[in-house]
Amino acid sequence: AQWLQDRWTEATGRTDPFEYNSENIGILSDMLASEALVALDNDSNAIGWYDRKIKAAKEVMSLVEPRIMQSPESEAVFDFVLAVTSNGQAVVDNFEMATDMFRFYQRKGRLPESKKEFDKGGERNAAMLEAFKFHNAFSASEQNRALREFLDEDFTVKELNAFADDFNSQIGFDAIKVPSAEGADVLVKGSYVLGPKIGQGFYQNIRGNYDPLTMDIWWMRMWNRAIGRPFVDGLDDTAKNDRR
């Protein structure tokens, strides 16, 4: 990281990170676009790599558990639990937990709601259980669309909050919790309720929609390297809101 920072200082002539302004946004856009073009020149197979790997992983999983690809409904359940159990987990652990949760659903027609039923995931266990409770509540409610349709539907954050308030009042508890990471007029998918990274990003990518960006730890490391703060923690929520 220090070597990269030294290269960054030499290339930019700066010692302080880029400030957040329109001029620097343009500079960073050009910088990252140039990196992407170099990567594509070195390996043109990078185009569509993620899509190919996701599809290949599902093909392998269908050998382990054939019911996953048995119907659009069963695939949607697996995609949901794969996204939810990715939270802070290694890839192998993620797929193992997702398979366990899929089989739990096949046996019981619902996902687990207590630590007695599901105690994996470490410190992310509570967040996973909250997502499972949401899945169960929505699936059991008499909505005019399937859960997978809701998760792929477009909303503004304001509209999604209104839907959540109405839904939660109908079922008597806060099954849907809309994150505050985006402004009220920002367009998101219903899956945003699972979180900006897990729901708006990774879940959509698993489902084949690659327009949303999954800003995981690797993306953040790239971004911090580009702006010149590889050793500094990211902005807190207050600073993020000030910049919207």
Where are these regions (language model features)?
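HhH-family (HhH-GPD) DNA N-glycosylase catalytic core used in base-excision repair
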Residues: 1-244
